[in-house]
Amino acid sequence: MLIGPVFAREVAIAPRRPRLYITRTLFCLLLLFLMSTAWLVLTGTQLVRDLGDLARFGSALFQLLAYLQLALSVFFSALLAASAVAQEKDRRTLVLLLLTSLSNSELVLGKLLASLLNVLVVIVAAVPVFMLCALFGGVSFDQIARMFAVTLASVLACGSLGSTLALWREKTFQAVAMTVLVLVLWLAVWGIVATGAVFDSWLGLSCQAWAAGFSPWQAIVEATRPYVEAEPALGPLGTPVHLFLLVAVAISVLLNGVAVAMVRVWNPSRESQPVSREEDTWRRQSIWGAEHDATRAPPEGASAADQTDSADRQGAPAGTGLLTEPRPGAQVSEPGGDLPSSVPAGSADPHRSPGDAPAPDALAPKDPRTRHVWDNPIIWREIRTWAYGRKILIVRLAYLVLFALSAGSLYWMADSGTSLVRGSGSAALAALFLLSLVLVNAQAVTSLTSERDGRALDLLLVSDLTPKEFVYGKLGGVFYNTKEMVVLPMLLCVYLWHAGALSLEELIYLLVGVAVLYCFAAMLGVHAGMAYENSRSAIGTSLGTVFFLFLGVAACMRIMLAFSGQFEAQLPFLGLIVFGGAGLYLALGVRNPSAAIGLASFACPLVTFYAITSFFMSQNHLAFVAIVAAYGFTTIAMLIPAIDEFDVATGRTTIGEQ
């Protein structure tokens, strides 16, 4: 068997799932569609005279498709690896795997490769499509080989990162959020190094060579160039691309080695292990009955000596559930008999007959540590308890590090007189906003998938909670747990207004628009968590939708500008956006299709395209109106069925069955 039975099982059953064939077919069709539309844009706006024009087209097309494939591969490899392990933890099946005869390496490596199988199959299926780029000219087979080597090494490293973090963290949100934050931090740090802000050269290597040797994005940029110059300082490695391949393999070996060594130390975590509290054991009912135990219980505030003496009178050691023979001369009350004369005054009700049951307060003394639940228990649990683990603070600290990098870069550019609105300033702020949207969406979808995998959702459905209490409670918990991710980027916007980079009108547009997008991301996560019973499908669909709406549309516009240089040649890409809207409708309306969700699915990509176009044309008010109208309508279209007629257990409407 290949790397143990876990991976062998996935290899055996994966071809039986239609998802394997649908995924690789859609990805290849996407690449072919982009290639065709790019050709239509080129021939519709420019005159192709000779082979040189074809070669330049092939080179530019190859680079853009390579960047797109790397972004998708890195994102989904890390996400699928983390969610696969987190799902095993939520369903308590990882403990069962630990009880088997599987070795640590078979468990860790088998689960890692099983989660990456779909990504690897999709990459292999894309090889013939990229070979077509060589037919245009300007692309060599060495470039294609280097590009795929960098992509596969990045997939292995990012998947190992997600798997290791998921084995370490005990909650799904912690695993997904930490994976995303580490990836962004990895790319951001080496992106800063590539600009020369840290150093120009070190140990004989330029800053660009160091960045290409340690960053997947910088490595793919270097690998897609026609000629890669060798660096004498690297010696036998030769080029920064070879250095990156070595670094990626070393990172994968290191992460998997740590995971193999620590998997049985980390799991099961302390939070999932049952803990027997001493107070609960003390209050355990003895063989003499609850009435006798209530009369023998020490009063509140009693010292440890009084508790020990009380336990001796009952014949049991303090703090244990064991029963021993009573001490000689001790008064023992038989079940149903009268209370002994040694009972303190006030411990029994004088108006109660000897045969009646004791008062409830006498049987269950009030615990001063008891907490009162709010009217909405869902939001109380989200806010007042450690519902997502005590180590969620690490996620917040990691985000604060990234926020400090963005804020520091903006302050440095403002101090040096660099424009904060265009160029690097807007890119840093946009990346921070996108990261915040991804984290808010991840918090929302994992709040539902964790309940479902932990079998707690069934208990909530049989309670007297209304759909509004459940949905609003989850949304309130999402914004509370991600308050740093929501508030801090908005404070940066206020700083830009204070620095004079934004007017008051633009600040209002930005804050209101971002608030609408936050609401959309949170509601999208709740909607996907309700619609999909499989946690990995829910997380992948939810985060993939955010990825498509913002980065996918931006990539289409980048391709359009690369081949035409103007906005007039938009018609071919409108077909691609409509195609994406159809896929979005299938993803969002899989369980609860409606006309509102259908309209929103086709409107969001078009409106995002229109908003970016309006921004480039300095028509900020049109971009604001389009974003607020489209994403606000989509949020309401997902919210209304959830609080009115949506059955979170089955993912379908139940009004027609009543």
Named regions from a protein language model:
Residues 1-77, 83, 118, 122, ...:
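Transmembrane alpha-helical segments and their membrane-interface loop/helix boundaries
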Residues 7, 84-116, 379-383, 387, ...:
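Helix-loop-helix units of permease transmembrane domains in multi-pass membrane transporters
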